[in-house]
Structures are given as structure tokens and as C-alpha cells.
Amino acid sequence: MELVLKDAQSALEVSETTFGRDFNEALVHQVVVAYAANARQGTRAQKTRAEVVGSGKKPWRQKGTGRARAGTVKGPIWRGGGVTFAAKAQDHSQKVNKKMYRGALKSIFSELVRQDRLVVVESFGVEAPKTKELKAKLNEMQLEDVLIVTPEVDENLFLAARNLYKVDVRDVAGIDPVSLIAFNKVLVTAEAIKQIEEMLG
């Protein structure tokens, strides 16, 4: 199959297994959920009454003081005491096989092509790290909500895009399922397309 280059009167020959396969919604959903889960920190932790540091001594005698009876200063009803059903650190990570991950990316790229959301160009960049210059180029191409994918990290492009709303720049190694579906358009250079095909096999 062929992808038409937006900035040239030519087309790029690409693999149908990467850019023309059926959309596997269940697989994409599973991989996106796993990706989001793996980003969770999961370090929240509180102490139970057993873990709070302090004396185990009865604060005052059982009878005769006129105060409510108390057996410990570490109970949940005391200030500085333990927490009932305290939250503990959890590992939220989910395992995703390489084959599944690659399959999900292929499904996403194929769906982007079908929905006309994948914009392929011969090359893309800015001469200086100027937001104004990048904004003008994107306006010329009628692109606003866009993920720009380049073969390698382009510092000028990265710095120019940093202050633009709904514009992100990634190299091929930095793309992920969530970013690909989060933006309205994905702008990819011809060289990046070749690298994506090599990466996904």
C-alpha cells in the first residue's frame, strides 16, 4: 500500500501489515490500560495502629479519673494514632508481551490511516528554536492538535513546540499508544515511517 506525502507530489510504499491491518479494539484497549497502569506510582502508604511508633502503656488507670477509658494512645480515635484500614503501597503494573504491544501500535497506525489522521511529509523541522516559526508552519498545514514524530530527537523542534498547546514532539523510540490516540493528527516524516516499520517488524 502507499501513503501520499503531503509536501511532495509522490507516495511512500509501506507494509500493509503495519499500516493496513484491521483495528483490534480489545487489544488496543488492553495495551492502553496497561500503559496507564504502569505509569502509576503506587507509593501511597499509611500506618495502622500496630505500626505507629509509641508506648504500649495504658495512658491512665481504668477507673476513678472521670475520663473515658483508654488502653492505648495509638488507636484510630486518637490524634497521631494509626489509621483504620490503612492504605498500603501497591504495584499496579500489568504485563504486556512485545507481540501484543507491537500489534496494538500497528492497529493504531492502521486506524489513523483509515481516519485520515496520519499526515506523512518528506521532512519537517525549524531552523531555530522559535515557537512563532513552528506555529506558522503548522497553521500553513492546518494542523493544531498534533503529535510530531521525527526519526531522532530534534532539539530545535522540541524547544519550539514546548510552549504550544496540544502540540508534542517525539522521536520514533519515544512514541506510545496513549500519545498516538490522544492527538487529533499525527505528523510523521518519511524517514520516521521507515523506522516505525523496522521497529514493528
UniProtKB/Swiss-Prot annotation:
Keyword rRNA-binding attributed: yes
Region ranges (Disordered): 46-71
Keywords: Ribonucleoprotein, Ribosomal protein, RNA-binding, rRNA-binding
GO cellular component terms listed in the entry, alphabetical order: ribonucleoprotein complex; ribosome
InterPro entries per the UniProt record, alphabetical: Ribosomal_uL4, Ribosomal_uL4-like, Ribosomal_uL4_dom_sf
GO biological process, one term: translation
GO MF annotation list: rRNA binding; structural constituent of ribosome
Pfam family, one: Ribosomal_L4
Disulphide-bridged cysteine pairs: none
Presence of the UniProt keyword Transferase in the record: no
Protein family (similarity comment): Belongs to the universal ribosomal protein uL4 family.
UniProt subunit comment: Part of the 50S ribosomal subunit.
Primary role: One of the primary rRNA binding proteins, this protein initially binds near the 5'-end of the 23S rRNA. It is important during the early stages of 50S assembly. It makes multiple contacts with different domains of the 23S rRNA in the assembled 50S subunit and ribosome. Forms part of the polypeptide exit tunnel.
Descriptive protein name: Large ribosomal subunit protein uL4
Species of provenance: Shewanella piezotolerans (strain WP3 / JCM 13877)
